Amino acid sequence: MRLRKKPWARPALEACSFFVINPTEYKGKWREVFGNSNEIWLELGCGKGGFISKLASTNPDKNFIAVDIKDEVLALAMKKIENEYALIGAETKNIRLMAHEIMLIHRMLDENDQIGRIFINFCNPWPKNRHKARRLTHPNQLNQYRTFLAPNGQIWFKTDDTMLFQDSIKYFEQCNFNIVYLTEDLHASGFEGNIETEHERMFLEQGCKIKFLIAEKK
């Protein structure tokens, strides 16, 4: 569903202490942004922020970068993050939110950033053959991620789409990743540590099984 234009979104984001206006300026320097050497985790397509707000607020020993493209959705994520941290009385020191085109993620990250973990949750499946190169798990993208993933860095991937999941398994293998965990029914698998996204709850209510894998950089 398309979000309505929110004129207040960009001014609110620019006034936010954890929003990064020009992320490409910090390519290779993200540890300096956070002011420590803690491992950095990255969510590509953070949406309304339900996932990243819980993950970041409960892992203060990690740093988090959350990326999406639309100001309207990022403004909702900003509010979700602020509320989640307020609930536990914590400061938003370990998270940064930004607008950036994910297909061009290499413009804001490089090998000096050593990302420990990437999360891709319920991305657009792009089912038509002519659009498949736009998938966030397509080899074109995976090869970008490899450049800034740390040794043994991981990609955690969730989807409700069977075709995308099956194709993505091939993509990961093709791009020299080890698949270290895989299930076609996450919520029946006994896997611990899952944080549900807004889309995930919706798909579960519809009776969909959630597919999930962890791929590790060789």
From Swiss-Prot:
Entry's EC annotation: 2.1.1.33
Catalytic activity: guanosine(46) in tRNA + S-adenosyl-L-methionine = N(7)-methylguanosine(46) in tRNA + S-adenosyl-L-homocysteine
Major enzyme class: transferase
One Pfam family it belongs to: Methyltransf_4
Record bears the keyword DNA-binding: no
Entry binding sites for substrate: 128, 160
Binding, S-adenosyl-L-methionine: 43, 68, 101, 124
GO cellular component, one term: tRNA methyltransferase complex
Keywords: Methyltransferase, S-adenosyl-L-methionine, Transferase, tRNA processing
GO terms of molecular function: tRNA (guanine(46)-N7)-methyltransferase activity
InterPro entries the UniProt entry points to: Lipocalin_CS, SAM-dependent_MTases_sf, tRNA_(Gua-N-7)_MeTrfase_Trmb, tRNA_methyltr_TrmB_bact
Pathway terms, separated by semicolons: tRNA modification; N(7)-methylguanine-tRNA biosynthesis
Keyword Transferase: yes
UniProt similarity note: Belongs to the class I-like SAM-binding methyltransferase superfamily. TrmB family.
NCBIfam families xref list: PRK00121.2-2, tRNA (guanosine(46)-N7)-methyltransferase TrmB
Function: Catalyzes the formation of N(7)-methylguanine at position 46 (m7G46) in tRNA.
Name used for this protein in its record: tRNA (guanine-N(7)-)-methyltransferase
Species of origin: Acetivibrio thermocellus (strain ATCC 27405 / DSM 1237 / JCM 9322 / NBRC 103400 / NCIMB 10682 / NRRL B-4536 / VPI 7372)
